[in-house]
Amino acid sequence: MPAPIRLRELIRTIRTARTQAEEREMIQKECAAIRSSFREEDNTYRCRNVAKLLYMHMLGYPAHFGQLECLKLIASQKFTDKRIGYLGAMLLLDERQDVHLLMTNCIKNDLNHSTQFVQGLALCTLGCMGSSEMCRDLAGEVEKLLKTSNSYLRKKAALCAVHVIRKVPELMEMFLPATKNLLNEKNHGVLHTSVVLLTEMCERSPDMPAHFRKLVPQLVRILKNLIMSGYSPEHDVSGISDPFLQVRILRLLRILGRNDDDSSEAMNDILAQVATNTETSKNVGNAILYETVLTIMDIKSESGLRVLAINILGRFLLNNDKNIRYVALTSLLKTVRTDHNTVQRHRSTIVDCLKDLDVSIKRRAMELSFALVNGNNIRGMMKELLYFLDSCEPEFKADCASGIFLAAEKYAPSKRWHIDTIMRVLTTAGSYVRDDAVPNLIQLITNSVEMHAYTVQRLYKAILGDYSQQPLVQVAAWCIGEYGDLLVSGQCEEEGPIQVTEDEVLDILESVLISNMSTSVTRGYALTAIMKLSTRFTCTVNRIKKVVSIYGSSIDVELQQRAVEYNALFKKYDHMRSALLERMPVMEKVTTNGPTEIVQTNGETEPAPLETKPPPSGPQPTSQANDLLDLLGGNDITPVIPTAPTSKPSSAGGELLDLLGDINLTGAPAAAPAPASVPQISQPPFLLDGLSSQPLFNDIAAGIPSITAYSKNGLKIEFTFERSNTNPSVTVITIQASNSTELDMTDFVFQAAVPKTFQLQLLSPSSSIVPAFNTGTITQVIKVLNPQKQQLRMRIKLTYNHKGSAMQDLAEVNNFPPQSWQ
């Protein structure tokens, strides 16, 4: 058989292909030749053929038939064969294929090889694609190489240990003795990988930071040497000594200094040194400064150091690089809760970012601008945000309008300003506002008795000839119907009165009724307004009767029903019409956002920043709730009854029975979800059904200590308790989930199960995202009925996405305080 062509010749041949079909033909022809060579067990050219196969794999063509040949090359004694074999294994194999387990013995032999380069190949492969089974079998060899004096092997072994810990976290303690001397190494590669290993251990186990805090002085010394060292061509990047190692050390210091006064004190000086001495003309220096800022803000640093960190972020906002401006805005958004006054100093720069062409920067600047709004700057900030609302892209208008509504409601200096601001939003972006904007504005106007004449006149002017903003038209129609007499009489004192006749008012409402832009809801507002004017106007009652009778035959069922009922009011109940259509009374405000939260910042009290994101609409991700019944093995379990219908019906049977086996399920199936417009009338009685729309308790049994139910991998779940003196069998547990890691935890779902003697109701969570750096929490309420006063116990299930991986964990909570159930 002729010798196969070399890899270089194959690459040159493939590059000459003019079409994709011609390239496929060349690849198929070469693959056929490689298969023939594999069948003949040709050891001479196996290495060359596998190398060509890997190139084809990189081009996107199938190369799975070369997997076993890679294993044969790994078993070879030639280094060149091993190198290609291990490379092929890393590209063609993964832990989902059983073939990779055949490599375990070869990797073990190579880890004990006398040549460091062979050992390095084995470490690289294990650290790249080793499964949990392989990691368990080979962790001992990795630990031995971690203690060797060879720096080439130590750095590779440290990275391999990181992979082992990720796959098998319970093997973490095996590597603890080997980590003691890692930071004494002079080699930067070993130092870098050692810091990566220590960081991974601290992130995986909540007990590790306390164990490694004794290394803080050593880490500080290493970082100081890097800053003070002279020019080193081996490690210099743009005039900075080994910035990669500096960034890694800063991240580890951030973890070790979190919630620890002594460690934070030990690193304050070096952080100040890094922040003041790092060159910012190059992107490398900006990366180090960014990590320094994150570390300063996350540990218990001095107030002066925090001001320095925020000033660095302020300088970042002036940088020409859009990426740097974006991370500065994101970081300021995280720190504004704790250092509100310091961030306020950079308000003008932040507002300027609203004019940036980059949409990501604009969105972050908008969110941060709303977070900076308070009672002192509300007028100036609203002026800028209204200008932004007028000129921004459509995808920003909904969030911006919602933020303006919340800010105006919270900090409005006067009712007139409040009404003018909301009307300006409705005029500018009426089609993008939330559904509750119309009733909220109507409620505000109703409660502002002294502003009725002013408001109806402004609204009348606003909709003259323009019905494009339907929410604005709806509010205007409602106000004209309620206060049309004030409009006609010209009683407005705030601005010059206008001369409007009754017929002109009816003309504009009839125009709304016949406009092609008017929705069915808007027409309903207009028809009701016309009907209400029959008790406020004196000269146009006959015209109103005629308009109402015309719509008695409308093809719109809702409009027709209204018109027929109004006609009946004229004909049969005319004596009651004035009483039925009298002016609406002052409405009581129903607060849905909870009380204003006050935070302490630098000795001054500031309102907590506004959340610009609307509350989550639609069903929460609770489809996995059925799996939770698997938690209490061997016990009868009461399934959780959700308080709101989910997107798909679930029951206590079906897939649950697959999970539970012989566990007896006694809970009734959950009812199928009802349509949103139809209330659920029949629902099985359940504990605390009558409390869902009322405050939970008026008399709370105080003095129940809170507990930490779960703390692992940066996620912490705390339980606080409330009990009613009038119904002591009911315990209300409020869970708070916080996240101390560097990335948000998304799609978070908390589930719980209790034994059959209890009843449990799990209310909807406040969000599905647990913010990073402990910048926010998810709250969720659990109601437990314990009529027999038995000791409370619970199993919980947590599912969420973190760092691109789906996480799931089960835990049992048995440490409930006696006051919560006795």
Curated annotation (Swiss-Prot):
Output the Pfam families linked to this UniProt entry. Answer: Adaptin_N (PF01602), Alpha_adaptinC2 (PF02883)
Q: Read off the SMART domains from this record.
A: Alpha_adaptinC2
User: What subcellular compartments does it reside in?
Assistant: Golgi apparatus; Cytoplasmic vesicle, Clathrin-coated vesicle membrane; Cytoplasm; Cytoplasm, Perinuclear region
Q: Where is this region: Disordered?
A: 597-628
Report how it sits in the membrane: Peripheral membrane protein
UniProtKB keywords: Coated pit, Cytoplasm, Cytoplasmic vesicle, Golgi apparatus, Membrane, Protein transport, Transport
Cellular component, GO, one term:
clathrin-coated pit
Give all residue intervals belonging to the GAE domain: 702-817
Can you tell me which residues the record assigns to a coiled coil?
none
The UniProt similarity line reads: Belongs to the adaptor complexes large subunit family.
Assembly behavior = Adaptor protein complex 1 (AP-1) is a heterotetramer composed of two large adaptins (gamma-type subunit AP1G1 and beta-type subunit AP1B1), a medium adaptin (mu-type subunit AP1M1 or AP1M2) and a small adaptin (sigma-type subunit AP1S1 or AP1S2 or AP1S3). Interacts (via GAE domain) with RABEP1. Interacts with EPS15. Interacts with SYNRG/gamma-synergin. Interacts (via GAE domain) with AP1AR (via coiled-coil domain). Interacts with CLN3 (via dileucine motif); this interaction facilitates lysosomal targeting.
Database matches in PANTHER family? ADAPTIN, ALPHA/GAMMA/EPSILON
Q: What does this protein do?
A: Subunit of clathrin-associated adaptor protein complex 1 that plays a role in protein sorting in the late-Golgi/trans-Golgi network (TGN) and/or endosomes. The AP complexes mediate both the recruitment of clathrin to membranes and the recognition of sorting signals within the cytosolic tails of transmembrane cargo molecules.
The protein's name: AP-1 complex subunit gamma-1
**Organism encoding this protein:** Pongo abelii (Sumatran orangutan)
Q: What is the lineage of its organism?
A: Eukaryota, Metazoa, Chordata, Craniata, Vertebrata
